[in-house]
Curated annotation (Swiss-Prot):
Transmembrane segments: none annotated. It holds the Pfam family Peptidase_M17_N. Its EC number is 3.4.11.1, 3.4.11.10. GO terms for biological process: proteolysis. It is found in: Cytoplasm. Mn(2+) 1 binds at residues 274, 351, 353. This is Probable cytosol aminopeptidase. The active site is at residues 281, 355. The keyword Lyase does not apply. The gene is pepA. Binds 2 manganese ions per subunit. Presumably involved in the processing and regular turnover of intracellular proteins. Catalyzes the removal of unsubstituted N-terminal amino acids from various peptides.
Amino acid sequence: MEFSVKSGSPEKQRSACIVVGVFEPRRLSPIAEQLDKISGGYISSLLRRGDLEGKPGQMLLLHQVPNILSERVLLVGCGKERELGERQYKDIIKKTISTLNETGSMEAVCFLTELHVKGRDTYWKVRQAVESTKDSLYTFNQFKSNKPETRRPLRKLVFNVPTRRELNLGEKAIAHGLSIASGVKASKDLGNMPPNVANPAYLASQARRLADDYETVTTKIIGEEEMKKLGMTSYLAVGQGSHNESMMSIMEYKGHPDPTAKPIVLIGKGLTFDSGGISIKPSEGMDEMKYDMCGAASVFGAMKALAKLNLPLNVVGVLAGCENMPSSNSYRPGDILTTMSGQTVEVLNTDAEGRLVLCDALTYVERYEPECVVDVATLTGACVVALGHHISGLISNHNPLAHELINASEQSGDRAWRLPMAEEYNEQLSSPFADMGNIGGKAAGTITAGCFLSRFAKKYHWAHIDSAGTAWVSGANKGSTGRPVSLLVQFLLNRSGQENEE
């Protein structure tokens, strides 16, 4: 689909359809009022008749409105004007796209980007309209033998901005939105892939393909033989029960004017299937453990968006690919592992495996002398209990970095919430036989997991995002969400100084 921005009066638009808002109760938005005036009160007369109340998501398609050049006018219910917030705005955009496709419109001029959304500017409204549109059109049906035929005639969407001064800002918002949407789609596709296809080698192949597609990206793969030489015993232990080789895929993006500038490092947990190992999970819902690689998928998506945006940064993306399976060769509860850092870990539960993979990845990236490190993982069910399915958990050893990420989460709408990491929580990881256990009991499970990782991130500024509750949705519409790609890319945009410059 082609996106563009323009600034103009609604009555002068020659298009298949003009999209304008209506508030409750039957109140025309400023743009709709202009159309109503030109049409001699035609639209307001329909509202007085009760054809549209203005409730969120209500739609009314008008044909041949008097004195209007466009073929049709789509009235979109936006709820109460003062209550129009971010979530409702995105939902309205998605519903609008669905309706435009259902009505057969090939092009449309959308004035919803001129609505007032609390605390948001034109850049945000245009970018979110692009991201929401792309999200609403996403499908994953490549494994269906009979693919459903979906009617999608809409090919061109123009967003109107209030003044010509904002055209450049709108164009930048479209470019950013398309790049982020591309990264989100890549992340969703990886997450939704079945585990018999998306194994660690598949993650590696996608990382190589990214390097093939962009000159700014180089990729190297570390397999089990090299991991042994590096002393990544903890990482290797998790995957030793699977016939699929563990692979750590490293993508290096160099866009900074100084190629030696310290990089930002992103690490994603890539458990392509997590059965729990010897501490096996219940069978109900185990199919969703293919999503345990969504941390890696989000890092891959962020790297793809970064390459498309061509930001002036150096960034390293690490996909920590592995599979946790039960077998006669699996690691066991009671095993003591010596990590790459030299610290020892008593395995108390083989289903707390993500941290055992990440700890060696965190040690490995010390060689880059990073500006900062952010790891992303579907790490703990405790995070779902604490924050539900709407907000990711955040833990950090550096207040400014944590504030940057929280700010990026608010800007992008891909929200995170910082959890504490006090010394008292570290005491729960004590082991009588090793430097630490790999779990800290039932209490504060997300925090103790973060405390565990922090022991391997002492040489740089570090943050951990737990996306266990936000990386996918269950039920009839189950699937990967692509989160937190938007948060990560916003963080990188902010670091580059290009977040919403005109």
